[in-house]
Amino acid sequence: MIPRAVRVVRGWVCGLGVLALAVGVAGCGGPGIEAASPSPTPTFLAQETMCEVVPSRILVEEMSFRTTDYAFEHHTSTGENGANTDTFICNLNGRQGSMTATFRIRIAYWPGATLNASSPYPFSDLDNEPPNNDLQPISFDDVEGRGYIWITNRNRAITAAWLYPDDHALEIQLFTNGEADYAYDQNDIAAMTDLLHALIPAIPPVAARTDQSRTWVPFP
């Protein structure tokens, strides 16, 4: 397995903050206190697109992921050499399949060949990983760049990474909060590959727009 990805996912679970609180699970009762009742059935968003770019069709039909809420932001700027250094962040919470645990998708588009869905590290770290069955190279005929996709954290997380020709990098993570006994497999890899393929061309033009401060849907 790839230790970094495990650390990244754990950091994201611990640092989710306000967005996580919006869909937190019910607490446990203590001595002399009646246990909390089960959480009500969540309300799933019916939008065709989440975070302006994420197709709900792929989430629902291919990943069995139904979104309860999300937050996103994007910013544009110019680097020292005059090149665009745009950023885009999208965090989605939801349910996967028939399970009641919270599942999360985190998406980050970042300059400087940096992967930053949870904590920053260079794309070149993936190139330098020794060959193994977890890290799978990936490419598409109709888009420029190259990437990897892999399963980590005892099969409880999938990560996809993409390096654009202009050295922006895209990272997508799909994982459970640790409460669900679920193991991802090659079918999930195929679904994540389709999501990556859709987002590679969709995110850059949105990230280059006028800055969008962090926006929650629905607003907590």
Features from the language model and the residues they span:
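C-terminal motif of bacterial Sec signal peptides marking the signal peptidase cleavage site
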Residues: G24-G27
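Hydrophobic alpha-helical membrane segments, chiefly transmembrane helices and signal peptide h-regions
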Residues: G17-V18, A22
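A small/polar (G/S/T-enriched), proline-flanked helix-loop surface module common
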Residues: G32-P220
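Bacterial N-terminal signal peptides that target proteins for export
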Residues: I2-L16
